[in-house]
Amino acid sequence: MLRSKLSSLREYLTPINHNSNFSTTGEISPEEFVQAGDYLVYKFPTWQWSTCPKNLQKSFLPADKQFLITRHVPSYQRASNYLTGGNVDFDDDEEYEDDEEGDGWVKSRKVVSVTKPQDGQEEEPQEINDIDDLIDVTAEGAEDDGDNLEDFDDLDIRNDGGSVRKYDMYITYSTSYRVPKMYLVGFNANGIPLTPDQMFEDINADYKDKTATIENLPVAHNTTSVSIHPCKHSSVMKVLMKHSKSKKTREEVNHLSEELGKTNISDKSQEDTGKDAEAAAGPEAEDSIRVDQYLVIFLKFIASVTPGIEYDYTMDAL
């Protein structure tokens, strides 16, 4: 717990910065953290603001908005099984996306999603190149699975003995890194707290040694948690915001191009129409990721660190 004490000391000694520069640095101020938390709670009511004992409260945050929490989030299988089982395979090639510091901490594998073949047809793999495509394919697969639930009335795969776990998830504000920080507190099927080693089983192996840490939960007394260390959160958030902004900009430009193509501007070439669409989308596209959406993108990142914990229902929030 030495690292936990050092982390607490660093949080205490770091002065509060109220300046806003999230779009350029990936960091947010305490006020922006509250704003992003309000948006998360509004969009996803399973997340709630909460208070903590007075001696643990941070004076720069409202007393009733010290941290965000969602409880009893299920985990049906361990991270290693989640990444190697089912219908999603990783090929041998790995892609690394370096942040601007060149640390290569944002790591992604090429993913091949195998679709269920029709009669007489072979399976055709669909390559997925970014996190949003993976989320979209996962959502489509969930819908397909829901259509076939009646075929499995007598089969309860998820509730397999003691494999089901529940997690309470806490999001606090880190003053030393100026980003949100995630804490996990897990319980087994009987409600008994998990040991740190057991909770580590639900952390992606690629991140275990880099970012997962055993700490005392800073908003409660005598509670052991696993934290997702925020040292690289800002650079990771910059990458994810860039991806989300790029995807949204492409969608807006394509939509505007289609709309302009329906108008009676006969002397415009297709290239000119595309330029007009980009110009029309420009200001909105530049600001497409708002600061209040920050925690939604943050959770997309955390979902890659804890792949077996099923809380990433944020696909349609942006």
Curated annotation (Swiss-Prot):
Functional summary from the UniProt entry: E2 conjugating enzyme required for the cytoplasm to vacuole transport (Cvt) and autophagy. Required for selective autophagic degradation of the nucleus (nucleophagy) as well as for mitophagy which contributes to regulate mitochondrial quantity and quality by eliminating the mitochondria to a basal level to fulfill cellular energy requirements and preventing excess ROS production. Responsible for the E2-like covalent binding of phosphatidylethanolamine to the C-terminal Gly of ATG8.
Chain positions covered by the region annotation Handle region: 235-293
Positions of region (Disordered): 83-104, 244-284
Primary subcellular site in the record, as a coarse category: cytoplasm
Gene Ontology annotations for the cellular component aspect, listed alphabetically: cytosol; mitochondrion; phagophore; phagophore assembly site
Basic and acidic residues compositional bias, start-end: 249-261, 268-278
Biased composition (Acidic residues): 89-103
Record text on subunit structure and interactions: Monomer. Interacts with ATG8 through an intermediate thioester bond through the C-terminal Gly of ATG8. Also interacts with the 40 amino acid C-terminal region of the E1-like ATG7 enzyme. Also interacts with the ATG12-ATG5 conjugate.
Keywords, sorted A to Z: Autophagy, Cytoplasm, Protein transport, Transport, Ubl conjugation pathway
Family classification: Belongs to the ATG3 family.
Keyword Endoplasmic reticulum: no
GO biological process, one term: protein targeting to membrane
Location relative to the cell: Cytoplasm
Record's comment describing the protein's domains: The N-terminal region is involved in phosphatidylethanolamine-binding and is required for ATG8-PE conjugation.
GO molecular function per UniProt: Atg8-family ligase activity
UniProt-annotated catalytic positions: C231 (glycyl thioester intermediate)
Renumbered residue ranges of the record's region Flexible region: 82-161
PANTHER family in the record: UBIQUITIN-LIKE-CONJUGATING ENZYME ATG3
Protein name per UniProt: Autophagy-related protein 3
